[in-house]
């Protein structure tokens, strides 16, 4: 059985927004958060595109092999009204169900992703998605799992490498998080992995991830305790997939063929993606016209997936 885990935030939930702003102001005053950290506070991080229903339609149309979809939200009020909560293939999971209590509430995708292995009922084989990762054409199971292992790109590298194998030349918080992760991997394995963050669906083994989480739980929770928001002290969930490769627990291949990553903008011709299997439609601070781009994207997705899925209420 193969499950999919997807995270979702409803920015229009006033209670959630008030809570977000409370912790943001508190941590800025305490010096724990940088108000200029766009990785935590940029409007593009949680801007509402209203395309989640099309994500579910893509799953139903193109990933018939999926056992269940685990929708991760902070609490019950974050669940979309149109969602068919009684559908047997849908499992709604709240942060309190799998994240350590001392870290709650959290608004940090890094923290949330690190604790996915704690989710009860989750199958051993699962795929992690964001809500902007779309399956546009039929996908076979062996794209993600082959020979009993998750499929990942081969990005193992030699010990002596340029700049020690770390990302340089930027103060971007996310790059610092990636470097933290690379350094931690080297510390515990004496091996290095190339920068390998792919903003597309990623295959996991719950059994393996849980073994790593349990073994290094003190180090991981320490990294996540500093702030409620993404910050330079975090590790990222790519820790699990990098270690899969280091410990030879992955099948090496290319799950991302005929797929791409797109930074959204108003001048994009979405028909370009008609022959793509998977696409990440990524929001950025450089987006020039949100409303126009949103309309064009929704029109494209509605044309691609015009029929409701069983994940949606009938009425």
Positions of predicted regions on the chain:
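Short, well-formed alpha-helical segments that are part of the catalytic scaffolds
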Residues: 48-60
């Amino acid at each position: 059985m193969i499950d999919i885990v997807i995270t979702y935030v409803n920015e229009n939930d006033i209670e959630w927004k008030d809570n977000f702003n409370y912790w943001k102001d508190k941590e800025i005053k305490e010096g724990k958060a940088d108000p200029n950290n766009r990785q935590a506070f940029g409007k593009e991080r949680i801007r509402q595109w209203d395309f989640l229903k099309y994500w579910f339609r893509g799953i139903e149309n193109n990933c018939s092999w999926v056992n269940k979809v685990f929708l991760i939200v902070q609490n019950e009020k974050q669940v979309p009204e149109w969602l068919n909560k009684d559908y047997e293939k849908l499992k709604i999971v709240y942060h309190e169900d799998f994240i350590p209590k001392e870290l709650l509430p959290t608004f940090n995708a890094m923290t949330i992703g690190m604790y996915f292995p704690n989710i009860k009922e989750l199958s051993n084989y699962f795929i992690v998605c964001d809500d902007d990762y779309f399956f546009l054409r039929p996908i076979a199971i062996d794209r993600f799992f082959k020979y009993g292992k998750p499929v990942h790109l081969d990005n193992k590298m030699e010990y002596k490498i340029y700049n020690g194998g770390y990302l340089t030349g930027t103060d971007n918080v996310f790059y610092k998080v990636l470097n933290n992760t690379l350094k931690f991997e080297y510390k515990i394995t004496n091996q290095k992995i190339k920068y390998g963050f792919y903003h597309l669906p990623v295959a996991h083994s719950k059994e393996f991830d849980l073994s790593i989480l349990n073994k290094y739980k003190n180090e991981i929770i320490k990294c996540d305790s500093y702030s409620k928001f993404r910050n330079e002290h975090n590790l990222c969930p790519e820790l699990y997939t990098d270690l899969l490769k280091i410990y030879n627990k992955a099948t090496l291949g290319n799950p991302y063929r005929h797929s791409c990553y797109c930074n959204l903008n108003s001048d994009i011709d979405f028909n370009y993606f008609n022959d793509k299997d998977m696409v990440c439609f990524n929001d950025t601070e450089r987006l020039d016209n949100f409303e126009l781009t949103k309309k064009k994207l929704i029109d494209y997705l509605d044309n691609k997936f015009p029929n409701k899925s069983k994940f949606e209420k009938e009425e």
